[in-house]
From Swiss-Prot:
Assigned keywords, A-Z: Endosome, Guanine-nucleotide releasing factor
GO cellular component, one term: endosome
Amino acid composition bias (Acidic residues), ranges on this chain: 43-52
UniProt keyword annotation of Cytoplasm present: no
One biological process term in Gene Ontology: plant organ development
Phylogenetic placement of the source organism: Eukaryota, Viridiplantae, Streptophyta, Embryophyta, Tracheophyta
Role: Plays an important role in membrane trafficking through the secretory apparatus. In complex with CCZ1, acts as a guanine exchange factor (GEF) for Rab7 protein family. Promotes the exchange of GDP to GTP, converting it from an inactive GDP-bound form into an active GTP-bound form. The active form is involved in protein trafficking from prevacuolar compartments (PVCs) to vacuoles. May serve as a linker between Rab5 and Rab7 protein families in PVCs and mediate PVC maturation.
Chief localisation class: other
Keyword Mitochondrion in annotation: no
Name assigned to this protein: Vacuolar fusion protein MON1 homolog
Start-end of Pro residues biased regions: 7-19
Compartment list: Endosome; Prevacuolar compartment
Species name: Oryza sativa subsp. japonica (Rice)
Chain spans, region Disordered: 1-52, 65-129
Length: 567
C-alpha cells in the first residue's frame, strides 16, 4: 500500500529520469483447455535448480566455431562489418589471436559441479516431450516466417512446428490490425516481443510480471544485436525465408548466461550497473591510466572485475548505457576464448548504435579482472595491444590489481556492519533488566538477519545509473531463497513503476516470507527485505540509516563523474 515517504533524504540531488509513456497493453485470454493436456505445472519441478544456480561467472565453451558461417552469411547479405583480417590477425567472434600470448600462465581452475552447464542441455527434448512441457520458463527467438532461431530448451530444429504456431498467433493478431503483447492461460503467461522480422517469446509460470518478462526479452534482443547488429534485418528484406540460426551458432553459452542472470543480477531490471568497492585513490589511479590512451582511437575503456565496474572512461559526448555494459560483460564472461588469450572481436552496442559494429579488444589480467577497449577502427589491434601493455604496467606499479583482489574477497556490504542508531546508543537499559535478558534481546535481533530484522537491501542511484546491494545473510544463504527474494524485488519494482497505478513513492508489503519496503525519491531507489514480523516504523528508521550509510561510503562504492579520454 502507499504511505508517506520517510524523512531525511540523505542522497545527493540529481536529475530524475522521466520515462516515456507506455503504450496500451493488448491482452488475450485462453482457457486452460486450450493448452496441451500435458502442458502442466509441477510445483516440485524447478528447471533452474536442475541446471545449477549461477553463483559465479561461468567459463563455458568458445563461440569461435560459428566465425566462418557468421562472416560468410553476412557478406552474402551485404551487411558484413569491415573485416579486421587485413591487419594480419585472426579475430572473429572472440577467437584467439595468432600472435597473442595467454592472458595468464596459471592453469584455469575447473568450474564447480554447481556451475551451470557448458552447453545447452536437454537437446533430446521437443514439444512432444513431457519433460519439456514441465519447464517453468521457456524463451524462443524466431523469424517472421516461423523459422526457429533459438530456444532455451530442446533442439531448435525439432521445435520448427512449435515456432510456426507462435508465428501464426502473432500474424493472426497483426492481420486484424492489432499487436499482441501477452496471453494468459491458467498459470502460464506468454509474452511476445516483435522487433521487425525477429519475434521473441517467453512462456512462463513463474508469476513474474508482464513488464519484467518483456524487459528480459528486450535484453535477449539486445544480446542478439550485440553479436549481429540490427543490420541483419537486411537479410530478411532480401529473403523473407532467411535462416538466421547459423549466424548465432555457438552462442548458446552467451544466452544461457543471460537467462541465468535474470535470476540473480539486479542489473537486469534496474537498468543500472554496479561497481567494485575500492578506495577512492585506487579508483582514481585506474581512471587516470585509462584516460591516457588518446593516441589509440579508443571510444570507451572499461576495467571490470567479473560483472562489476572498476573504472569507465569514454570519449567526449559519448556515453555508455548500463544495459550495454551488462550485455558486453555477459558476452565476455560467458566466452572462454576471451579468458585464454587477448582477443579482438567485432561487437555492437545496441543502446549506443544498433546499426554499426565496434571492435572490442579484451584482455584478462587474472581470472576475474579484465580490460575492454572499444574502437571504431578495424585495424587498431596492435595499437590497443600496446595501450594495454602500458595500462597493465601502471596498474601493477600502483597495486591496483592487488587491491581489486582484496576488495573481491573482503569488501562486500554486510547488514551486520550497518552503523548503530546514534539515538539508541545514548539510552541505557533500565536497571531492572538483567544482563542475561539484555543479551537475549540483542541476540534475537541479530538472529533474524540484522538490525530491526533487516535481511537485505538494494540501493540505486538514479543520477549515476549505479546500484549497490548487500550480501545475503545466513538466513537467506540457500540459492532457492535468494532467487525467491530476487523475484519479489522484481515484482516490487514493477509495482512501483506501474504507469497505470503509479508511479509510487513508497510501498510496504508483508507476506509469509518477508516484509518488503521500497522508497523512491528523485535521487535514489531503495528496496529492502525484512523479517516478516518486522515493525513498519522500525523498518523506516533502518532504511534511513541504510541511506546515510550509503552516503558515507559513496566515494568507495560508486564511480563519480565518468572520466573522458584525453583527446
Amino acid at each position: 500500500m502507499d504511505m508517506d515517504p520517510p524523512t531525511n533524504n540523505p542522497s545527493p540531488p540529481g536529475p530524475p529520469d522521466s520515462p516515456p509513456p507506455e503504450k496500451r497493453l493488448a491482452s488475450l485470454s485462453l482457457r486452460t483447455s486450450h493448452l496441451p493436456p500435458d502442458f502442466e505445472i509441477h510445483d516440485d519441478y524447478d528447471d533452474d535448480d536442475d541446471e545449477g544456480y549461477l553463483t559465479a561467472v561461468s567459463r563455458v565453451g568458445s563461440i569461435s566455431t560459428s566465425a566462418s558461417a557468421w562472416k560468410d552469411d553476412l557478406e552474402d547479405a551485404d551487411v558484413a562489418p569491415p573485416s579486421p583480417s587485413s591487419s594480419g590477425y585472426a579475430a572473429e567472434r572472440g577467437t584467439s589471436l595468432a600472435s597473442s600470448a595467454a592472458a595468464n600462465d596459471d592453469p584455469q581452475p575447473q568450474p564447480d559441479d554447481d556451475d551451470w552447464p557448458r552447453d545447452k542441455k536437454h537437446l533430446h527434448e521437443d514439444d512432444t516431450s513431457a519433460s519439456w512441457r514441465k519447464r517453468k520458463k521457456h524463451f524462443f527467438i524466431l523469424s517472421n516466417s516461423g523459422k526457429p532461431i533459438y530456444s532455451r530448451y530442446g533442439d531448435e530444429h525439432k521445435l520448427a512446428g512449435f515456432s510456426a504456431t507462435l508465428q501464426a498467433i502473432i500474424s493472426f493478431v497483426e492481420n486484424s490490425g492489432d499487436h499482441i503483447k501477452f496471453v494468459r492461460a491458467a498459470k502460464h503467461q506468454i509474452v511476445f516481443l516483435v522487433k521487425g522480422p525477429i519475434y521473441l517469446v517467453c512462456i512462463s509460470c513463474t508469476e513474474e510480471s508482464y513488464e519484467g518478462l518483456r524487459g528480459q526479452l528486450e535484453l535477449m534482443y539486445g544480446q542478439m544485436l550485440l553479436i549481429l547488429t540490427k543490420s541483419v534485418n537486411r537479410c530478411f528484406e532480401k529473403n523473407p525465408k532467411f535462416d538466421m540460426a547459423p549466424l548465432l551458432g555457438g552462442t548458446d553459452a552467451v544466452f544461457l548466461s543471460l537467462i541465468h542472470a535474470f535470476s540473480w543480477n539486479p542489473a537486469t531490471f534496474l537498468h543500472a550497473y554496479t561497481c567494485l568497492p575500492l578506495a577512492q585513490s585506487t579508483r582514481q589511479a585506474a581512471s587516470a591510466v585509462l584516460q591516457d590512451i588518446a593516441d589509440s582511437g579508443v571510444l570507451f575503456a572499461l576495467l571490470m572485475c567479473e560483472h562489476k565496474v572498476i573504472s569507465l572512461v569514454g570519449a567526449q559526448k559519448a556515453t555508455l548505457h548500463p544495459d550495454d555494459i551488462f550485455l558486453l560483460s555477459n558476452f565476455i564472461l560467458s566466452s572462454e576464448s576471451f579468458r585464454t588469450s587477448e582477443s579482438f572481436s567485432p561487437i555492437c552496442l545496441p543502446r549506443y548504435n544498433s546499426m554499426a559494429f565496434l571492435y572490442a579488444y579484451v584482455h584478462f589480467f587474472d581470472e576475474n579482472t579484465y580490460l575492454t577497449l572499444l574502437t571504431a577502427r578495424s585495424d587498431a589491434f596492435y595499437d590497443l595491444k600496446d595501450s594495454r601493455s602500458r595500462i597493465q604496467n601502471v596498474l601493477l606499479k600502483a597495486n591496483v590489481l592487488v587491491e581489486v583482489q582484496r576488495s573481491l574477497r573482503e569488501s562486500a556490504l554486510r547488514i551486520e556492519d550497518l552503523p548503530a542508531d546514534p539515538s539508541s546508543q545514548s539510552v541505557s537499559p533500565p536497571p531492572q533488566f538483567s544482563q542475561d535478558l539484555h543479551f537475549q534481546l540483542l541476540s534475537s535481533e541479530m538472529a533474524i538477519g540484522g538490525p530491526a530484522g533487516l535481511w537485505h537491501f538494494i540501493y540505486k542511484s538514479i543520477y549515476l545509473d549505479q546500484y549497490v546491494s548487500s550480501e545475503f545473510p545466513l538466513i537467506i544463504s540457500n540459492p532457492k531463497q535468494q532467487k525467491r527474494l530476487y523475484k519479489a524485488y522484481q515484482k516490487l519494482y514493477a509495482s512501483m513503476h506501474d504507469k497505470a497505478t503509479g508511479p509510487h513513492k513508497t510501498q510496504f508489503r508483508r507476506d509469509e516470507d518477508y516484509v518488503l519496503f521500497c522508497w523512491i525519491t528523485q535521487d535514489f531507489e531503495l528496496y529492502a527485505a525484512f523479517n516478516p514480523l518486522a515493525d513498519k516504523s522500525q523498518a523506516i528508521k533502518v532504511c534511513n540509516r541504510v541511506c546515510q550509510w550509503i552516503r558515507d561510503l559513496e566515494n568507495e562504492i560508486f564511480v563519480y563523474g565518468e572520466s573522458t579520454l584525453s583527446w
